[in-house]
């Protein structure tokens, strides 16, 4: 059975051009008119970025059309401004160290410590909002699986589960299950959780084709909406736009913070308004344990009446290299571990010395009110750009290829949490969740032993084991390793451990897959 599934997946990937099959080249656009070219050249010359057109006369008509279409929407003066600010940030004299404090108790909760009745109340409220078609999901899925040894979008990656389901499939089936639960609980038959999927230039086509091949994982295709994050030119250390070839500027995605501009530019916010969406859950594709549109999180955030809420997990120890969610000068913010001195990193909680004072690790798992997303045009221009120094293949002034062996330029990025400080504390909240239940990121290649396919698979299988034991089943195994004692529970029959009563009193031999009642 597993071999048959694997063959099917391999055939599908081949059909998607993810296994080396060449695509037919798309026709190149027509070149600009003489007047259009003159206007473009003047725009870039005035910004002292005219070198992007150095080799214009050498280009074919198709290459001219392609370069023109790429350069036309770029504002080189804007690139100059953000490059200058990012490369040469202003230094404030006598700048005081920022005041860092944990969130006040009024803005936080923990599923680890909270009573079950309160959690159940939030879950019920969240599921009711889902039943009223007021909840949507935004997935950040622009990354490729390069570090995993795959050219496919990261969401297509198979972490090695017995079912061989991809990350996309796990998440899509959780949405399907939630719709089913809301339908059944509130006697509806038309519950919809729209799934907005942000791709990037390199992943857009392959992602959409993957969803087509997989029949949208049982979801209505009209409620799965793809959109693309923006790109920014890569620049030299001196602020000059780098050219990848004579007919193409080097560009890179604008970071996960580009989601806000993309939501507006692609019409997603308008679509949400037309659907009556009020509550939005946003997350990254690489977390195999993510509780998509988590009713408990939605209910908690809605009850608080906040514009943004975020999930966190407890920092493992003082040295774990994670960003921390906290108050910075009285505003919600995320502070990188490099900004924390050892004294602050090791400080313990005033009420419980076994806990770190600053322990809310950022897992990029957020709630937004629709009103906040609708206000994006009022503040998106204030988001800072961050510099990521990279080795960027390009051409030199003579048009010769340059393959640098050390960073030669920068990619400009925005971070999704850069808007947090725009809010007052009363409009922000944080929910601490169990790491083993909700966070297992896929970052590294197989065999790394940390945040890799093996740890992702292990965490899914151990969660399934806990689900079954919670339902009253007994797990046995002939294998001596922990992974051999795990069970894969399909999201189609259980979102968070519910619906498994039929296993009460039964003995399940692991490893096993529970796909349906039997």
Predicted segments — roles?
Residues 2-18:
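Composition-driven recognition of long, low-complexity, acid-poor segments enriched in small hydrophobic
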Residues 27-222, 233, 244-261, 269-270, ...:
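N-terminal glycine-rich phosphate-binding loop and ensuing alpha1 helix
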Residues 137-139, 197, 226, 282, ...:
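Structural beta-sheet core signal
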Residues 138-142, 229, 433-435:
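Short loop/turn segments at strand-loop or loop-helix junctions that form parts
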Residues 149-152, 206-212, 236-241, 292-296, ...:
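Short acidic, glycine/serine/threonine-rich loops at helix termini
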Residues 194-195, 223, 307, 427:
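Residues at the starts of beta-strands that form the adenosine-phosphate
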Residues 216, 221-320:
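Conserved beta-loop-beta/alpha segment of the NTase-like Rossmann-fold superfamily
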Residues 276-281, 289-293, 298-480:
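Catalytic core of tubulin tyrosine ligase-like
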């Amino acid at each position: 059975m597993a071999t048959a599934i694997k063959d099917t997946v391999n055939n599908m990937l081949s059909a998607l051009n993810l296994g080396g099959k060449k695509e037919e080249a798309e026709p190149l656009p027509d070149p600009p008119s003489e007047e259009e070219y003159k206007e473009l050249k003047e725009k870039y010359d005035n910004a002292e970025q005219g070198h992007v057109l150095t080799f214009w006369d050498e280009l074919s008509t198709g290459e001219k059309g392609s370069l023109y279409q790429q350069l036309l929407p770029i504002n080189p003066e804007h690139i100059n401004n953000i490059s200058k600010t990012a490369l040469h940030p202003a230094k404030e004299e006598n700048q005081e160290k920022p005041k860092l404090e944990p969130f006040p108790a009024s803005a936080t909760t923990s599923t680890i410590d909270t009573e079950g009745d309160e959690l159940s109340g939030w879950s019920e409220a969240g599921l009711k909002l889902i039943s009223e078609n007021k909840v949507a999901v935004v997935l950040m899925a622009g990354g490729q699986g390069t570090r995993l040894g795959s050219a496919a979008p990261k969401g297509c990656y198979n972490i090695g589960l017995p079912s061989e389901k991809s990350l996309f499939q796990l998440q899509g089936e959780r949405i399907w299950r939630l719709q089913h639960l809301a339908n059944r609980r509130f006697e509806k038959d038309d519950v919809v959780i729209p799934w907005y999927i942000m791709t990037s230039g390199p992943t857009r086509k392959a992602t959409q084709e993957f969803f087509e091949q997989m029949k949208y994982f049982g979801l209505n295709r009209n409620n799965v909406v793809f959109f693309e994050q923006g790109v920014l030119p890569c620049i030299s250390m001196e602020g000059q736009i780098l050219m990848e070839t004579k007919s193409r500027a080097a560009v890179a995605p604008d970071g996960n913070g580009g989601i806000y501009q993309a939501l507006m530019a692609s019409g997603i916010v308008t679509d949400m308004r037309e659907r009556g969406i009020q509550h939005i859950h946003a997350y990254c594709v690489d977390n195999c344990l993510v509780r998509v549109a988590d009713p408990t999180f939605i209910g908690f955030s809605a009850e608080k009446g906040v514009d943004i809420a975020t999930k966190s997990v407890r920092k493992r120890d003082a040295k774990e290299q994670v960003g921390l969610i906290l108050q910075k000068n009285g505003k919600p913010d995320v502070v990188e571990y490099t900004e924390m001195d050892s004294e602050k990193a090791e400080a313990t909680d005033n009420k419980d010395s076994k806990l770190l004072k600053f322990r809310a690790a950022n897992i990029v798992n957020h709630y937004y009110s629709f009103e906040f997303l609708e206000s994006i045009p009022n503040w998106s221009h204030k988001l800072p750009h961050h510099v990521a120094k990279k080795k960027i293949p390009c051409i030199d002034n003579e048009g010769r290829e340059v393959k640098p062996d050390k960073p030669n330029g920068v990619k400009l990025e925005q971070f999704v949490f850069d808007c947090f400080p725009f809010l007052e504390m009363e409009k922000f909240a944080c929910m601490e969740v169990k790491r083993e239940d909700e966070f297992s990121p896929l970052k590294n290649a197989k065999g790394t032993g940390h945040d890799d396919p093996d740890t992702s698979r292990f965490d899914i299988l151990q969660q399934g084991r806990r689900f079954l034991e919670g339902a009253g089943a007994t797990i046995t195994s002939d294998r001596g390793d922990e992974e051999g004692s795990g069970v894969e529970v399909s999201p189609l029959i259980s979102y968070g451990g519910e619906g498994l009563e039929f296993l009460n009193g039964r003995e399940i031999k692991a490893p096993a897959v529970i796909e349906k009642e039997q």
